[in-house]
Amino acid sequence: CFSMSRFITRFADVVKIPEPNLAPVNLNDLVFSCKRFMEGMCTDRNIAITLDIDEELGGVNLDIALFEQVLVNIIKNAAESIGKDGKIQIRTSSPASIEIVDNGEGITKETEVKLFSPFFSTKPNGQGIGLVFIREVLMRHGCSFSLRTYADGLTRFRIIFN
């Protein structure tokens, strides 16, 4: 009963995502701070987390608090899909985009179509709200995005700022 109550409260928080408070943000600074925040979790799992940044990339208007949550959630999902002993690379490029690449388990085509659905999770104790939150924030920022495992076995979460 307690976990259902907690779940409903958390899901209601997702539904109540505030309108983005947009301000100019340097994407390279943003990904650097999110990488630093997640380094402890990755080190504990022997996961190398690296940056490949486009030094020429300018700023974009976004809600930094919401976007930090988005990127941390994506990196956390990548680390969880790896488990132990893997790699996560965070890239920025022009035109303004961020790509998080990991060598974790990967996503099947069947799973890919369900990923952003409420209550769907591939995790044993997952509640299916993390990617819903990410989708909502990205849509409110006018971003296009994709999450897919490619033939090379790497999974890429790509965010393009339109």
What are the residue ranges of the model-derived segments?
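Conserved micro-motifs of the catalytic ATP-binding
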Residues: I17-P20, G59-L62, T122
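Short beta-strand/loop element within the Bergerat-fold HATPase_c
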Residues: D85-S97
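Short conserved segment of the HATPase_c
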Residues: I107-F119
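Detector for a conserved hydrophobic position within an alpha-helical segment of the HATPase_c
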Residues: I134, L138-M139
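Glycine-rich ATP-binding loops of the HATPase_c
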Residues: G142-R148
